[in-house]
Amino acid sequence: MKLNIYKQNYQIVIEYDGSKFVGWQLQKNGKSIQGEIQKVIKQVFGMYFRENITGSGRTDAGVHALGQSANFFIYGGINPSRKKVLLNRWNFLLAKKGISILSIRTRNKNFNARRSAKERTYLYKIMNRASSIALDKNRVWHVRKKLDINVMKKGAKLLTGTHDFSTYRSSSCTAKSPIRTIKKISIKKNRNGKILLRFVSKSFLQKQVRSMVGCLKFLGEGKWNISKFKISLNSKKRSTCAPPAPACGLYLEKVKY
């Protein structure tokens, strides 16, 4: 049935535990974050919600989010005074699924969570200690061998800027160009042995961040020196890349518009 009423665009910011899902995008072989969110929107709005939501990035299976952004349209719009009630209802329905909708705001019709993004920040967490992990399983990459973050920072400096990142690109990546500009990479280690790596860019190739982290880890543990790291970057060949870091340590932290 055609609805002869206007449709309003909305943006939501989402936090989720990616370990329970096949990824962000709708898939036939399992539960996706996109699918679970669409279910609760449909449950509230029925026929007034007719189009798939659009995410700022299609996070892979096991990848988490602290600030994923998405947009969708509702025919007839949402009463502004009911947004808080609506958030509470959605989060009640999503609570056991490991998903939380943090905020909702009205956007103009041209806003697109993916295409309108100016900057994305990904956070990668490494727990660098010999002892086993009790609290952060499926939340960090546990690396027992001590990593030299100073040499990792030198590698990160080489990755910063505009490059052909074919080395770090998944074979299934559909991006038209491997050229990307990394605006900033920061690496910090806290007292508990947790290393936090942040990557900032307008966009990334599929598995690019995890592949870069894998190479930086090789550098930090001494398997590679800076020369080998540079050769890998400049080769533009996937075969020269270290094994990608596991999905469990990766978080889509925030998206800027």
Where are these regions (language model features)?
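Structured-RNA-binding interfaces characteristic of tRNA pseudouridine synthases
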Residues: K2-Y257
